[in-house]
From Swiss-Prot:
InterPro entries per the UniProt record, alphabetical: AlgH-like
Pfam families named among the record's database cross-references: DUF179
Species assigned in the record: Pseudomonas syringae pv. syringae (strain B728a)
Annotated GO CC locations: cytosol
PANTHER family: UNCHARACTERIZED PROTEIN YQGE, UPF0301 PROTEIN YQGE
Record family assignment: Belongs to the UPF0301 (AlgH) family.
Protein name: UPF0301 protein Psyr_0485
Domain of life: Bacteria
Amino acid sequence: MKKVSPSYLKHHFLIAMPHMHDENFAQTLTYIVEHNANGAMGLVINRPQSLTLADVLEQLRPELPAPRHCQDIVIHTGGPVQTDRGFVLHPSGQTFQATVNLPGGISLSTSQDVLFSIADGYGPDQNVITLGYAGWDAGQLDAEMADNAWLTCSFDPAILFDVDSDQRLEAAARRLGINLNLISTQAGHA
């Protein structure tokens, strides 16, 4: 039997199964930033908050009024860990004080300068901004996968950047050819 690398879910989407009852993850689509022997880290990308970039900028640079377009840039709940910490997924190309290039032509930036750049019209134009992240201890995500808590879907930048937040979960499921309303809550193991 071929051994699967423990990082096999990095740069994939996790689709919460319909029977997921954890309020932090029920009906979520999560982008997996990292998955290795030490655990996993991801960002929920379909949970918009009532908070906007304008609200965040009011806290970060209160001396400057936020540009009007910032009222239309929604902040998402990225997960239950460190909910005061910001993360921005965006296409690769621009780098900021704290930017990590990820597979598939996307980057993750965590410094305030990315927010200022978006606000000031210098981009990145395509972005998903989250507060908080989802974290799993070593083996925890693997165990949840074995318990059928999640489906996995290969990454598609169109789902991340071109699909409205409230449609991302269904778009990822459609990519697999699945209607989440028709999935059984019971599964067997051969």
